Amino acid sequence: MLKNNEILETISMIKEQNLDVRTITLGLSLMDCACEDVKVLSEKIYDKITKTAENLVKTGEDIEKRFGIPIINKRISVTPISIVAASCNCNSYLDIAKAMDKAAKEVGVDFIGGFSALVHKGFTNSDLKLIKSLPESLANTDIVCSSVNIGSTRYGINMDAVKLMGETIKETSLITPDGFGCAKLVVFCNAVEDNPFMAGAFHGVGEAEKVINVGVSGPGVVKKALEEVRGKSFEEVAETIKKTSFKVTRMGQLVAKEASKLMDIPFGIVDLSLAPTPAVGDSVGRVLEEMGLSNCGTHGTTAALALLNDAVKKGGLMASSYVGGLSGAFIPVSEDECMIEQSKNGFLTIEKLEAMTCVCSVGLDMIAIPGKTSASTISGIIADEAAIGMINNKTTAVRIIPVPNKDIGDIVEFGGLLGSAPIMRVSPGNCDDFISRGGRIPAPVHSLKN
């Protein structure tokens, strides 16, 4: 039987602590759309998305009304387009990106992901076409998101892809306002197939025809819970986070199952990730400071983040029948009011953020850098982050934005959930010769598990 204090606690979480479901994401296979004619393929993709997802937004809104749970985004992820379009006789996949954009707008979702390629061991002709299509595709669409997987623990790092993605990010930044196209482009190592979060979501080839995946949020709830155990031992801190994570994830499980039932689409996973927003009271950085840090980014931050990330997973695992996606704590600089502030104050640097990515979900996320940064430096940042993922057998990623005509200390405004970001310093050295070597960095010895 529900107790009054539990009901009041839930209401407080939603009304005062910014508890929400960050996204309901429909994963959709486009394998049956394959066609040699890119125009026909684009039409098939549009038709399948609009037919399958026609009730996605309404379903989310109905669940919001029924349970009183805010659902911030409704999204779609599709099979990596480099696979779907492999038989096309064309030089660019811009028409496909436009069809995805049009279909997503037609059904009313916030973003659609899957304009993607998996090149961790090498390129197919289709992979190269897609990557070369990225700048113009991101410049000519509004809500299409893209990702490229350039490495894995099993196969090493494709350094040719790392070099190419540095050049692609640089080019994209030059043809989109304030480099905004780069905010819709993620470079992965060890990408997962069931990620509900953008911009890195795609529907993996091992997935079902269609699934419902849900991503939860709630850093504000965790911070409020930690306020009750100030000065207590780390054991109590971990226990508090675990109990809170259970409650947050349980809500995500409820929404996922309900959406699955209403749409008659199988339930996939709940992603346990704590995802911040620029709103005050919805910050992962403030959770870390609540543990006893004067500033997020000071010494001790990596340890605090490791504790948070692990406790969130342990608590959430019991609350859902299927946990997947990225499942950890996100540290997107422009989307977290605390991290924005501490970046301005000099406590958070790219080097410190890189250390933090060793122990949390994903990687260097929504970081703005000077527009004059070279393509090889961007490739070097990608290579460093991919190495962390490869060696530690975890997902890492880079979503970095070179902002034209901006330099260290300037501010760029992206708006909405993407927030704003100070332009951060990159190393003045260069890695041109290193990046130009080409080939693959071999997989680590512990990849040989058979």
Swiss-Prot record:
Family matches, as InterPro entries: UPF0210
Entry-linked Pfam families: DUF711 (PF05167)
UniProt-listed Gene3D superfamilies: 3.20.70.20
Family matches, as HAMAP family: UPF0210
Subunit-level organization: Homodimer.
UniProt similarity note: Belongs to the UPF0210 family.
NCBIfam families for the chain: PRK05313.1
PANTHER family in UniProt: UPF0210 PROTEIN MJ1665 (PTHR37560:SF1), UPF0210 PROTEIN SPR0218 (PTHR37560)
Protein name: UPF0210 protein CPF_1748
Species assigned in the record: Clostridium perfringens (strain ATCC 13124 / DSM 756 / JCM 1290 / NCIMB 6125 / NCTC 8237 / Type A)
